C-alpha cells in the first residue's frame, strides 16, 4: 500500500513513477520481495518536496528514502551512469526523463523490469522471457556491465543459486574474461554474496565461480580443495566436491547449520 501511495502521489504531481528491480522479479516469481525500490522522473528535491519525512540516503546519485509508517522506501531519479573507475560507483550521474535509459544501466534483464498500476509492466529487455527460461543474462553488453561493478559477476552466480537458474553463455564468458577484477571489490561485499550463495537452495553453484576463475581470486583455498582428490575408495569426490555435497545435504532453511558447515568466515581470505 505504501509503494502504491508513493507512486500515486508522484503521478498526481505530474511525474512518472514505477516500482523497479528485484521486487518486480520476485513478485512475478511468486516470492515475497525483501524490499521495494521506486524509480521516478522527479528530481531528488522534487521528491523531498512531496513527502513529509525523507532521508538523503544517496542524494548525489539521485536517491531519497521516503519514510512511510516507519518503513523506508528508496526513490531514485531516472539516471544515466558515467564511468565506474572504482568498479562500484559511477564517477558521474546524469539525470534523465527516460525510463528505458534508466533500465539500461541495470545488471540483469530479470532485474530491469518496472511496473505501476497505470502503465503496467515495462520489460524492454525480455526479463519475463529470461524468467520463463530460467536464465541470468546481462542487460546489453556483459563485459560493460561487469566492468562497471565487478561484484555483479558473483551476483550472477548467487542469483543462479537462489533461483535455480543457469547463466547465459555470453554472460558466463564475460565472467571468465573479467574474473580478475573481483580483486577490486571489498572482502565485506564479497562475503555478503558468498553467504547468500552458500545458504541458497543450490550452494553447489559455487562450482560456477570456480570454473570461471572467480574463486581463484577471492577464495583460493576452495580451488585447492576442488583439485585435491581424497584417494579413498569410500570417497569418490574431491575435497571441494565433498564439502559442497555436505553443504547441500543441510536443508536450505537451516541457515545456522549451513553456516557452520561452510568454510568458516574467519578463514575467508583474498589474494591480490
Task: Locate predicted features.
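Catalytic cores of the polymerase beta-like nucleotidyltransferase superfamily
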Residues: 1-272
